[in-house]
Curated annotation (Swiss-Prot):
SUPFAM superfamilies: Actin-like ATPase domain (SSF53067). A monovalent cation. Ammonium or potassium. The active site is at residue 109. Its main location: cytoplasm. This is Type III pantothenate kinase. The lineage of its organism: Bacteria, Bacillati, Bacillota, Bacilli, Bacillales. Its EC number is 2.7.1.33.
Length: 253
């Protein structure tokens, strides 16, 4: 079995694979102040609750967009799993041809998603990942990665509105029953939800105008909710990043 760890700005997602089967997955908060032992005790508790043994883990792969968290997690893997993790970074085997100005600038999460998508689906592909930032990536049928778009994430936008507008409340992200809101919360939910649906469809349309038709895959925490009204999202794959980590680990063994 292998343990995959995806560190995002808001959450850390962990998964355990037995060959190609995802046995269990968890989502915990990204905390830059946690120590090696705090992460270790937390992950051991998750394993214990799922009736999994840390001794059965034969390999670990780690991807992070939060550099300060890498060191304690690497140490956690060594101390609690007796395994040094394979860390996603420049120079690894991905099978992608990066057609961007500076390949080292491309986030590990975007590379991992692209690897998984090119294995699981026929290209050309557009990947929309709803995280702290919402990212869009274009990959052609020959697995050439042409870059994409980065925009503020849904939660970042709503928190900014709450923090900067004195009389506006913090809201739950939800799909409202109508576009026109009859109260403040409803109006904010409409602007957030339908605004992001429009953003996705508008940006995907522009990407297709530049690059040609492509299958649109959505992943990330709000992918399924946004896809309910999106005219362009065709596939929702909640485990795209975890699958990508597994695939990259296998290619680099």
């Amino acid at each position: 079995m292998i343990l995959v760890i995806d560190v995002g700005n808001t959450n850390i997602v962990l998964g355990v694979y037995d060959e190609q089967t995802l046995l269990q997955h968890w989502r915990i908060a990204t905390d830059r102040t946690r120590t090696t032992d705090e992460y270790g005790m937390l992950v051991k508790a998750l394993f214990r609750d799922a009736e999994l043994n840390v001794e059965d883990i034969e390999g670990i792969v780690l991807s992070s967009v939060v550099p300060p968290v890498v060191f304690p997690l690497e140490n956690m893997c060594v101390r609690y799993f007796n395994r040094r993790p394979f860390v996603i970074g420049p120079g690894i085997k991905t099978g992608l041809d990066l057609k961007v100005d500076n390949p080292r600038e491309v986030g590990a999460d975007r590379i991992v998603n692209a690897v998984a998508a090119t294995v699981k689906y026929d290209g050309p592909l557009i990947i929309v990942d709803f995280g702290t930032a919402t990212t869009y990536c274009y990959i052609d049928a020959q697995k050439r990665y042409y870059g994409g778009i980065i925009s503020p994430g849904v939660m970042v936008s709503t928190e900014a509105l709450y923090n900067k507008a004195a009389k506006l409340p913090r809201i739950e992200i939800a799909k409202p029953q109508s576009t026109i809101g009859r109260n403040t919360v409803h109006a904010m939910q409409s602007g957030t939800y339908f605004g992001y649906v429009a953003q996705v469809d508008g940006l995907v349309h522009r990407m297709k105008e530049e690059m040609g038709e492509a299958t649109v895959i959505a992943t990330g925490g709000l992918a399924r909710l946004i896809s309910e009204e999106s005219a362009t999202i065709k596939i929702v794959d909640p485990f795209l990043t975890l699958d990508g980590l597994r695939i990259i680990y296998e290619r680099n063994k």
